[in-house]
């Protein structure tokens, strides 16, 4: 299990892991490379292709643990890491199943116009970094909810619903990372996990979608689900936004569906 875009493992993933563990499942939760307690440079850079390789390494690690059956390993991802998991699963024959929630499935659908408009600037930034310049950083979240509501925010996760997540993190004392490298956008702009959905079969997929998601395109998520072959299962969490499925009442509905999927898969 890894968190989503710019996320850290302590941001509610422990709640999912605890419920899985209570049901008898061993769980590995880790920060993506360059984030939190994980090593790697550059710091605060999202690179989906490298994160795919890290899932393969995570499988290698857990499959060697004495209490893990390597024939019963499931990849789990959320938001950006959901997309990472979908693409990783498409090419990894070793795993037994896939759970994704509110997955990022298409850069073209999600950030295509923005990335195209910024392409020249981003490639100049890439060249400057390779030449020894310091990396430019971009804000992940708006500074205020008023900024988000205005529609003028230049933050990457600029929807007002992000403040549901921010406020809950602050309430629980969970750390937030508020900046990513500008070159993150170059890494993300070619990421198209929906192109590989058909390759995941025959591994079972559970896709959990938040009905009112404004951060990750719900239309793209549902389209990607249609691309996937059986066996597959779709869970739509009604009246929930992108971040509400991490905690509270919507979390309970979400985790119930995930545990039922695992029970059907292994028991």
Regions found by a protein language model. Name each.
Residues 5-18, 32, 219:
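The serine-hydrolase catalytic nucleophile loop
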Residues 19-40:
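Conserved alpha/beta-hydrolase
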Residues 77-87:
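Glycine-rich nucleophile elbow surrounding the catalytic serine of serine-hydrolase chemistry
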Residues 86-168:
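Alpha/beta-hydrolase-fold enzymes
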Residues 214-220:
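Conserved alpha/beta-hydrolase "acid-adjacent" motif
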Residues 238-267:
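Catalytic active-site module of serine/aspartate enzymes centered on a nucleophile-bearing elbow/loop
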